[in-house]
């Protein structure tokens, strides 16, 4: 009897070990292979200028994906992030022009993101309304506010010091890249090293069990959506700085790109599973694919098809992983 249990426990251990290694680093390996292939076959891909451009291109999605990671890990998602990006940029531009104060404008943009996240979190956690319906509604509301505040037009920013947020270079790299790295580190530590992060994963794994175990589910969910709104607002402010204006029509459909990156990297749509390395892998893969398509002059319409296929593949892959875990 004991020999059976010993041999039975030995076999799964090695397979689990391999599965754990693949789960941790598999998509990073996929990115490495993709990167090498692009460096070989795509003209001008491996140049320093293009690498800086790639870093800038994924910086915004990297920031927003940090907040989306927590939403997905808790079993929810946030469809309002793209609208918050646009509205935060517009709000910042309008307030800077009205007050002639850079910091008041930035604070107003950040406050808008926090308030949007607070509304999402309260309605979802306290009123127990489905996250899809709630964030779909706030997506429309916030986008509408962006058009109302800007009168449907791009709002130019008169204070040129604001542009330094998007165009500053620190140690040879653009500031948005460093800010994205900082976001990834902070949110990674928050998820893996704090009680808040463990509570987030517990809620996503089994919300009722987490509640019975004493996890403050409502408070945790509200904080999660506030964080998502905050990082989306930061991304929107930096985007406005780089575009030298707040534009209400920007980042339409961006929420799907961010969700695709998270799920492609390995974050589960059902909740309870998520690591910052998954987000890094997902945004790097998506960013590399998009960069390669641009260098190859692939039609923008065809790029929509490719993005859709990647999203579909990510969802199918997530479904397969969940099914495989249940059968083990």
Swiss-Prot record:
Keywords: Cell inner membrane, Cell membrane, Membrane, Sugar transport, Transmembrane, Transmembrane helix, Transport. It is found in: Cell inner membrane. It holds the Pfam family BPD_transp_2. It comes from the Bacteria. One of its GO terms (biological process) is L-arabinose transmembrane transport. One of its GO terms (molecular function) is L-arabinose transmembrane transporter activity. GO terms for cellular component: ATP-binding cassette (ABC) transporter complex, substrate-binding subunit-containing; membrane; plasma membrane. It is a multi-pass membrane protein. Induction: Induced by arabinose. Transcription is dependent on the transcription factor AraC, the cAMP receptor protein (CRP) and cAMP. InterPro entries: ABC_transp_permease. The chain crosses the membrane at residues 29-49, 53-73, 79-99, 104-124, 129-149, 171-191, 220-240, 249-269, 276-296, 297-317. Belongs to the binding-protein-dependent transport system permease family. AraH/RbsC subfamily. Part of the binding-protein-dependent transport system for L-arabinose. Probably responsible for the translocation of the substrate across the membrane. PANTHER family: ABC TRANSPORTER PERMEASE PROTEIN YPHD-RELATED-RELATED, L-ARABINOSE TRANSPORT SYSTEM PERMEASE PROTEIN ARAH. This is L-arabinose transport system permease protein AraH. It comes from Escherichia coli (strain K12). The gene is araH.
